[in-house]
Amino acid sequence: MSQLKPISSHMDGGAPSTPGKFKVDKSPFVHHRLRWHSSLAKLAFWSFVFLGLILLFFYRSPSSPPSSASDRRLLRHSSHPSAPWGGPSWEKRVRSSARVRSGRLTVLVTGAAGFIGSHVSLALRHRGDGVLGLDNFNDYYDPSLKRARQALLERARVFIVEGDVNDAALLTKLFDVVPFTHVMHLAAQAGVRYAMKNPASYIHSNVAGLVSLFEACKSANPQPAVVWASSSSVYGLNSKVPFSESDRTDRPASLYAATKKAGEEIAHTYNHIYGLSITGLRFFTVYGPWGRPDMAYFFFTKDILRGKGIPIFETPDHGTVARDFTYIDDVVKGCLASLDTAGKSTGSGGKKRGPAQLRVFNLGNTSPLPVAKLVGILERLLKVKANRMVVKMPRNGDVPFTHANISLAAKELGYKPTTDLATGLKKFVKWYLSYYDSGKRSSG
């Protein structure tokens, strides 16, 4: 398996030499030493700044409230799980869920009650892998949908531990009880627009939470291989299409994108220092049954049925807004292939023994379509005319288009999406009408 090149640092530029008594124009060696010391000081400074930010949100004082009521609610739910853990009965359930057929994987899936996490957990279980879920069941969107996914997993004998990835004691306990071979890290604070009013929840989940997970993994013996959810949002303001893994990712358009970019840099650090095998997956607009209510295809369906206006964004120059919509089953295949091809971590007890695998892949459909096309397909499937409203794209972190180059994933993972948007939306609408229009549930 070929390895990707390490993520380049953005602190490589030299700094002016400190003025003093030395005549650097006459001593290239001294000039080189001064530049080296200056660069070293610069690197040390930014390292301490970054470490300080991590510690700030890791050890946030209880007397310092988050920036909004929503932040307080989210952080409370994610930091203090309502279900107790520990004890013989609990450990028995954990071991039973993680029990594996001979030769298969033993996988901890974080965010297991989420959209992608629940699908991945079911797919792993169905092929005979040992699966244990972890989820904090926060209320970013209706928790009852997460509970319904949990019930689906329980019928497949997958146990979800209710807790948070920032709970170091819980993670340590889980790794003590089960020798996981792999971790599928899908727990994160999602959503681009939500970050504008609830920034602290993104740092807590996507930065501090990722560090907490990597800390547990690097200290485990044996160390698991880690596959985690990055995002296509890291491409930010990139205008080159299609987006390739080697494209620049230093211009995020939202705080969500910035936290995912930070996650990729953190992954590089833990791979380099501790020998963790890490694979990052850049998902492109995943949709399908059991999806997230905050996604456009989901709330468009709800609003079309209710006769509400459907905003169709256009760019300031009247351009089309398009997305690389990717069906959930195709994404799950990419996730499983990433787990199956992940190299072993090379550390032991927090010490690196040799170079470890570090990869990043795009998982998209590579066929972007205008959002207006999405609405048209929903109109036909629902047999209801949408009340369309063309509006300017707000400055809220959204980007005008996404388009994945999947050639690397095709080569390394055998990844090949097969579901077009019309077929995928047909399956989603069938599920939606069955789940919400049965008279038993409200879509909000």
Where are these regions (language model features)?
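Aromatic/hydrophobic pocket-lining residues that form π-stacking "cages" and hydrophobic walls in ligand
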Residues: 213, 263-267, 299-300, 334, ...
